[in-house]
Amino acid sequence: MTDASVRLTSPPTATAATRTLLIACGAAFIAFLDLSVVNIAFPSIARDYPGTPTATLTWVVSGYAVAFAALLTPAGRLADALGRRRLFLGALAGFAVTSLLCALAPTAGWLIAGRVLQGGTAALMVPSALGLVLAATPREKIGAAIGAWSAAGGFAAVVGPALGGALVEGFDWRAVFVINVPVTLLLIVAAARIPAQDGRLSAGALPDPLGTVAVALGLGGLVAGVTEGQRWGWTSAGTLTALIGGGLLVVAALVRSARHHEPAIAVDLWRSKPYALANATSFVFGAAMFAWLLSGPLFLDAIWDYSVLGSAGAMTIGAVASMVTATVAGRVGSPTARRWLGVLGALMFVACTVWMSTDAFGATPALWSAWVPAGVLGGGGIGFVVTVLGTAAAGALPPQQFAAGTGMNLTARQVGGALGVAVLAAVFAARPDDPLGAFHTVFALCAGIAAVAACLAALPVRTPSPSPDN
């Protein structure tokens, strides 16, 4: 890998850093919002395209998630190479255009294609935005910035169903996409004023194109295979092709990146033990977290017979707790204290999911006596863990690789999340006549996975002393 020549203007001011953080939080909000906002609109979409099989229409939901996870890693490398602000502005414009394409979709195929493109532009947007934040934020305040950024993304994922339900009931499913356009345009206007603080590689030093394509297709294949394996059949040709082919492409991209002077994957970052451990823990905890976030509203709907808006309101309890703990974790300066805060967060999540796997969460609704305290435990734990892991990963990155490093960290969490959701689907498929028992099993599995994450988070890792480039 060639040495990066970082072009910097004057040091960022506190005002510029705050403005950059607010813009990045807005971008995270809309990117993660669109992972979940369409779920509630799905029945309305299906009614508008009656001739399209349901199996095909599910790609309106999964197409975005697959493209998002597939492109996060190469997007981070591209942001560092092309310039983070440049890629961020282009991604915002692309997100607005693809949202409009989805809103105007005359056919299901058009809508699915629009969603895949929308997920791709979101993947370009997220690591470039976070890279801008890290470049504009003093090292001692990075934890607080990541805490705010994580809170915005987590809150979006939870309120997505409520917002989607309100838009569908008040207008039409197309409003779910239309609302992105003015929000994104406002972000473009604001982002154009971000100071040029981001690093750029020397002219022509773009990441290896072949390796970039390989890692994108490989991750996309793995996520698609894991996400759709239950529906396609785990031994079907489609699932095996996606999983085996995707795995081989990722391995090929890793081997090529280890030898290429401008690798598609920044494999050198994985030599940092704090960074590698943060990513491994993100992968494991992501599996438990995403399974819990999806099973929560399903439980409220199927077992306690809550309405869409009622379920969203109940889930907001955890989202608010997550925002509070993310803010608290971001203000902790000691690496040792942060590490134990991450362990505490994982154990809080374990306590929540163990509780939810018992008869306390039975057929009779128990909002105040069970759901609210469990939601505070689970959501609060997520806020601690996500912020601590994000700060640990960012703290191990040299400035010229901020976007590449955060992109891989987010990829680890998204791929782990896809695996967790696949486990959830497999449990429900195995117990179709016992939905309550299936939910209890899922919650127990979430607890076990989170316990593994707690053990990983507790491992002591010596943080290297900062160098002039780090």
Question: Which residues does each PLM region occupy?
Answer:
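Intrinsic disorder in cytosolic terminal tails and internal cytosolic loops
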Residues: 1-17, 201, 459-470
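Short helix-kink/termination motifs in transmembrane helices of multi-pass secondary transporters
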Residues: 30-41, 67-70, 84, 176, ...
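A residue-level signal for alpha-helical anchor/packing sites in multi-pass solute transporters
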Residues: 44-45, 132, 166, 256, ...
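Transmembrane-helix bundle of Major Facilitator Superfamily
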Residues: 2-193, 342, 354-357, 371
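Interfacial helix-cap and linker-helix signal at transmembrane-aqueous boundaries
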Residues: 45-46, 78-79, 163-171, 226, ...
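Hydrophobic transmembrane-helix bundles of small-molecule transporters
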Residues: 169-284, 288, 295, 306-307, ...
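Glycine/proline-centered helix-kink
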Residues: 127, 148, 153-165, 219, ...
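12-transmembrane solute porter fold
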Residues: 19-40, 237-242, 249, 261-464, ...
